Amino acid sequence: NKSANIFLVHESVYDHTYNVLLTRARPLGITLKRFDSYNPEFTNSIFGMLIQLPGQNGDLFNPSFLISKAHKKDISVCASIDPLAQVLIKPIAHFGVDIAIGSMQRFGVPVGFGGPHAAFFACNERFRRLIPGRIVGETISKDGEKSLRLALQTREQHIRREKATSNICTAQSLLAIISSFYAVYHGCEGLNNIARNLVILRSYLEQGLYKLGFIINKDVRFDSIDVYSSKSVEVHKSAIKNGFNLRILPLGSDINNSTGFGISLDELSNIDEIHKILDFIADAINKNIDFEEIPKDNLFNLNGIPLREKKFLQQNVFENYRSETDLMRYIFSLAEKDFSLVDGMIPLG
């Protein structure tokens, strides 16, 4: 339907992502509409939809019905995903999405006040010639060995300038390499441990907040918690005093008129950090907390969303480098194969 001009954006999508979409959509005559239902009404004027897993408040939902319903109306579905969450949940492609996007910041790259971070982009066969950038594929060399070459002609020389896609994205090569070696170092087992630990710590934090009398909704969550409370102003002030930066809820408000707070954990979070958080929250509401009373059994809980069944990263390279010395030697061996301006001139084109 070429007359369709509405693109749906789920409420789970980060606000800053939505603002970027607005900037791109306006000059193209595309109307963005946010929706918060898991069973929206799809009209003929809608051509696409963006969802996010986990959502901006950490919630994980099963998008199967939503995606299936969209496809029946010939609506393309794009998913913004967290690679660390993908370690645990069913691969996003198996849900039937058409396009998957995301940031690799999770894999060994500090937050850095917003970036830069390497992005990733994947799509089904239908959109392969619309992928931005230059696509490298595997082939066989004249000597019968595996080799890499540019696989799709997305360059300006072959396509009318306004439809060329090779020059509409920026290569964050160094950051992509850092994230790749993070996966090489940890492998399937290590990444699984990191992701599972995040879920367990988040669940433990939830149990501690319950003990302090807070009410938290029962959504399935990965690494984040949203709490609404009449004591949120006091909690925010106590957090700042103790060196923590909590999310101010609702979005767009400031500390003095906030009605809630959000907490997000990451790969560096540990039990000591959780205890510090619970301590300053307890102090803010004039209560005491006994960590021995917090339940510690069955903390890994992602009920309601299909989990990954098969192992991933099974190539030898993700199994062989578990010490820093081995990894350093491997990186250097690859660097020695590189040809750069250090070695000679590189012709353009």
Where do the protein language model's features map onto the residues?
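Short glycine-rich or small-residue beta-strand-to-loop segments that form or flank ligand, phosphate
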Residues: L8, G260-D266, F312-Q314
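Short acidic (Asp/Glu) and glycine-rich catalytic loops that position anionic groups and cofactors
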Residues: K2-S3, I46, I99-G102, T154-R161, ...
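Conserved PLP-enzyme active-site core in the AAT-like
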Residues: N1-S147, L209, G213, D226-V227, ...
